[in-house]
A protein has these predicted regions:
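Terminal catalytic/cofactor-binding subdomain
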Residues: 1-167, 175, 210, 330, ...
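Loop-rich catalytic cores of soluble enzymes, especially ATP-dependent carboxylate-amine ligases
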Residues: 127-128, 132-313
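Beta-strand elements of well-folded, non-transmembrane domains
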Residues: 42-44, 104, 187, 324-326, ...
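Structured core elements
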Residues: 41, 180-184, 319-321
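Charged, low-complexity interaction regions
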Residues: 403-409
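Conserved aromatic-histidine-acidic binding/catalytic patches
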Residues: 28, 107-110, 114, 182-186, ...
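Long, well-ordered mid-to-C-terminal structural blocks that present hydrophobic/aromatic surfaces
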Residues: 278-362
Length: 454
């Protein structure tokens, strides 16, 4: 979840400006970059509870501790709520899940080092505060009521609005963690092709990375409960975006979609004005009830773009949003998977060949089925595991052709070894944890905090 943007306060007088924001993301291939984001759950080592914001063991104390590594604090109402350094940021999700939004980097080698460096810094400070951090898709032990709330104006508005539009939106906010990657496009046509491929294959990523099988200490019947949660959060701003596959799709059609997504807020002069459920189209006419007469700025539009949560999201780049969070190796594998598919022309063509004849019903069956069944979901006489094997194969070939090597001469394809192992075994991370729960853990989720912490 993004923090308020800092785009120019240019007033919006014409819909064309909104289209130009998306078009301004176009970059030649040599300028394509990789932006990886991941979230993680904090817990107190003594009782495994999530830390509150305040206090000697609190999230603010952790953020303050991280400033020793050169991070610059960002404050809201006098409280440190985020950190900035060299194009990267550390921010807070609603219940204090700690998010690293990485800088725009050139290779997976760089993004994996960036993630590892961050995890090391967090571990050092967290250890002093007797905190730990866990990478999974859903909080395995604590109830919604057990989760603290961070003091951010945006989240206060969303917290009151979510229960009006879905049963599980508050769980999405407080009890989920994801890993995602942001990738570039060269032209509108390139964006469309990448958008279609990544939407169709997003359920494959959900299956491969499935790691949220527990709710409140018990198996919940899902392998990616985090993915299921998005199906009952807010239908106006989530889903598989069928219109992306329609003839004529492009920037204009996506702008129309965003204009139909109800607003959450307008951020003016350091204040979040609650505009939940109101229309950005009305805002453009100066008819926003909460700010009568005011016209939106490009900052308002940039903020509004972050309040849509489809499986793949377009801003000035494409965001892959389907995967559960996990350990360091999978935080490197997720961007590698998508870079291999989308940043090599032959791989992108092969991926499109794989999915181009999927029907709308099939795309929805994949999206709706993988949260529960993951790789074992039946599909066209085989299973999702077969699709995943092919997608991983295409991605590995794409990374080999990309041939971005580290100092030891290795290309980026090695980052997919962890996915190859999941495909070969047919076992998702969630299924491995369920086996431990029913075996060595003796029906307790508590060992997950020791055995799978960063």
């Amino acid at each position: 979840m993004s923090s308020p943007s800092h785009v120019a306060d240019t007033p919006i007088t014409d819909r064309r400006q909104l289209v130009e924001v998306l078009a301004s993301g176009e970059k030649p291939a040599q300028q394509w970059r990789i932006g990886t984001e991941h979230e993680k759950f904090g817990f107190r080592l003594d009782e495994l509870r999530p830390p509150t914001f305040e206090g000697p063991q609190g999230i603010e104390a952790l953020l303050t501790g991280l400033t020793r590594f050169g991070w610059e604090p960002v404050r809201e109402d006098g409280r440190t709520i985020a950190l900035l350094r060299d194009g990267a940021s550390v921010t807070l999700e609603p219940a204090g899940q700690l998010e690293l939004s990485g800088a725009a980097l050139e290779t997976i080698h760089q993004t994996c080092v960036e993630t590892g460096t961050h995890l090391g810094e967090v571990a050092e400070v967290a250890g002093e505060l007797r905190l730990g951090f866990l990478g999974m898709g859903f909080q395995p032990k604590w109830t919604r009521a057990d989760m603290p709330w961070m003091p951010k104006g945006r989240y206060k508005i969303m917290r009151s609005y979510m229960p009006k539009v879905g049963q599980l939106g508050l769980d999405m906010m407080t009890r989920t963690c994801t890993v995602q990657v942001n990738l570039d496009y060269a032209t509108e046509a390139d964006m469309v092709k990448k958008f279609r491929v990544s939407l169709a294959l997003q359920p494959i990523a959900t299956a491969l990375f499935a790691d949220s099988p527990f709710t409140e200490g018990q198996p919940n019947g899902y392998l990616s409960y985090r993915s299921h949660i998005w199906t009952d959060t807010d239908a106006d701003r989530t889903g598989m975006l069928d219109f992306v596959f329609e003839d004529g799709f492009g920037y204009e059609r996506y702008v129309d979609y965003l204009l139909d997504v109800p607003m959450y807020f307008s951020y003016r002069d350091g204040i979040y004005h609650d505009a939940s459920g109101q229309s950005f189209r009305d805002f453009m006419q100066g008819r926003l009830p909460v700010l009568p007469g005011a016209l939106p700025t490009l900052r308002d539009w940039s903020d509004h773009m972050t309040t849509a949560f489809p499986e793949v999201r377009l801003k000035k780049y494409l965001e892959m949003r389907g995967a559960d969070a996990g350990p360091w190796a999978r935080l490197c594998a997720l961007p590698a998977f998508w870079v291999g598919l989308l940043y090599d022309d032959a791989a992108l063509d092969a991926a499109w060949d794989l999915v181009k004849d999927f029907s709308l019903a099939e795309r929805h069956a994949l999206r709706d089925g993988v949260p529960k069944h993951a790789l074992k979901l039946p599909f066209r006489g085989g299973t999702v595991r077969d699709l995943a094997a092919r997608a991983v194969e295409i991605s590995i070939a794409g990374l080999k052709r990309r041939a971005r090597r580290n100092a030891d001469g290795q290309d980026e394809s090695g980052f997919l070894d962890v996915l190859r192992e999941i495909v070969d075994s047919g076992l998702t991370p969630a299924e491995r944890k369920l086996a431990l729960f029913h075996g060595r853990w003796n029906g307790s989720v508590d060992p997950v905090f020791a055995e799978f912490a960063y």
